[in-house]
């Protein structure tokens, strides 16, 4: 027979786990909110695209899980379709290659936590201010790279590396200074070529970031993920 002390201890552990999970996602069912706001799970459009949401882990620049149990990448439907088209073309290039998504639609609450982390540091230039929302906060941006047989290919720097090596506006200089390899440059160019062909634009400080729509247009016409 299980003693009452064991039962009490087990109950405490369960309550702690529930609190941790609730704290991580602010008590909000993020997947349900994404759907409520009209976004779609990329896996329902193309299940071959890999997803590894870095802000659903603790190994990120904030140092905490900001997405709780959310593991799916959500976008506006037209963005998801464009990514599926990129994936098809990438597979035509080499069947062993695949897109991998590191971040997708991002709640405004997560944007606030990111901003709070960097606002008093030089790294604030890498993070959009949360009060009006950036492209991620409207479901129209993606942080993405390429894997070969499930292994990330060389892009010259890690995702979310806050350094000039992540910038794309002077890659010839990075190559000349041997800060990136020719292979890494070729890989970046492949990703950019495929993404641009589907209407995505780049952000000069992050090789992994792509977006669609002017941000002012998005603020007028799309719903901010204000949760």
Name every feature range the model reports, one short phrase each.
Residues 1-10:
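Bacterial N-terminal signal peptides that target proteins for export
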Residues 9-18:
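Bacterial N-terminal signal peptides
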Residues 23-104, 114-205, 214-227:
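Extracytoplasmic cell-surface/polysaccharide-interacting catalytic and binding patches
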Residues 110:
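Short, well-ordered surface patches within globular domains
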Residues 210:
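Conserved metal-phosphate-binding beta-hairpin within the catalytic cores
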């Amino acid at each position: 027979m299980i003693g009452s002390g064991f039962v009490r201890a087990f109950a405490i552990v369960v309550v702690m786990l529930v609190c941790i999970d609730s704290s991580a996602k602010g008590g909000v069912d993020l997947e349900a909110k994404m759907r409520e706001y009209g976004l779609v799970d990329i896996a329902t459009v193309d299940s071959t695209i890999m997803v590894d949401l870095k802000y659903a882990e603790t190994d990120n620049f904030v140092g905490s899980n900001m997405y709780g149990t959310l593991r799916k990448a959500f976008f506006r439907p037209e963005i998801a379709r464009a990514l599926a088209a990129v994936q098809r073309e990438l597979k035509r290039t080499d069947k062993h290659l695949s897109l991998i998504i590191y971040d997708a639609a991002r709640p405004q609450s997560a944007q606030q936590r990111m901003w709070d982390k960097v606002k008093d540091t030089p790294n604030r230039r890498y993070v959009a201010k949360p009060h009006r929302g950036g492209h991620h906060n409207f479901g129209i941006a993606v942080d993405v790279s390429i894997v070969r047989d499930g292994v990330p290919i060389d892009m010259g720097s890690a995702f979310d590396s806050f350094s000039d090596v992540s910038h794309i506006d002077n890659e010839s200089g990075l190559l000349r200074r041997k800060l990136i390899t020719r292979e890494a440059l070729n890989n970046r160019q492949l990703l950019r070529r495929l993404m641009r062909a589907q209407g995505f634009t780049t952000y000069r400080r992050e090789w992994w970031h792509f977006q669609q729509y002017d941000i002012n247009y998005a603020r007028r016409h799309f719903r901010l993920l204000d949760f």
